[in-house]
Amino acid sequence: MAATTSKPIALVTGATAGIGAAFAEHLAQLGHDLVITARDLARLEQSASELRSKHGIEVEVIKADLATNEGIRTIELRLENISRPIEVLINNAGFGINKSFSVSDRQLENDLLDVLVRAPLRFMHAVLPAMKERDSGTIINVSSVAGWIAGGSYSAAKSYLTVMSESLHTELLGTNVKVHALCPGFTRTEFHQRGRMKMNGLPEFLWLDASEVVATAWRSSQKGKALSIPGSQYKLLSFLMRYIPRPIVRKVGMNARKRQR
């Protein structure tokens, strides 16, 4: 369904579960109409129906596989549609690979880069001109504290997303366009199950709630901050990862990866 009201419109990728679904719910509560995207059309339609019924908003559904150029281009075209401008962009879609790089599937590695790096880059490039023109807009990139450690392609991709967000945040200082990196730790979502990652034995205090993660990110972004790290435990971890010797950081990253296999 196309948005027809005068409410601000937010586009959320990977919107059917986890942090993406929490962002859709949070923005709906704030009065935004939504464009939600994911690969599973049935789940998208179900989510859209629930959001419309609960919040009385317009919800547009776009099925797109961001591991393909066609899928990325579909979202780009929507972001470039200035007749129904996107006020908020949430780059959330992502997945992990539960194998070491040397034995993982090469196409899967390329897909990871498309979804976690190329898609957010192209989406930001598509939406920023209109945001700058009207001097209004928010982009939140869902990164990860994994970007601070040596944890394979996923960590490398999240490191890129964090640094790119910080760079654009600095570039846009003095405007009303906000770019923000959300860097959560372990969050209760479908992410780990889909990636077949073993999370048994992870201490309870390390788990975060998706709704609280999203609320933290939104508050921080609207205050003009470049990034947010929800949870005191992850703030401490991020601080340590930046200042302890890199050999230790590399060992922590590799040990964490091994425990998940």
PLM regions and their residue ranges:
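Conserved NAD(P)H cofactor-binding loop of Rossmann-fold oxidoreductase domains
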Residues: 92-97
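Conserved glycine-rich Rossmann-like NAD(P)H-binding loop of the short-chain dehydrogenase/reductase
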Residues: 30-47
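Residue(s) in the substrate-gating loop at a strand-loop-helix junction
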Residues: 144
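SDR active-site lid
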Residues: 171-233
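Active-site helix of classical SDR
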Residues: 124, 157
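Conserved glycine-rich cofactor-binding loop
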Residues: 16-17
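Substrate-binding pocket helix/loop in short-chain dehydrogenase/reductase
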Residues: 100-113
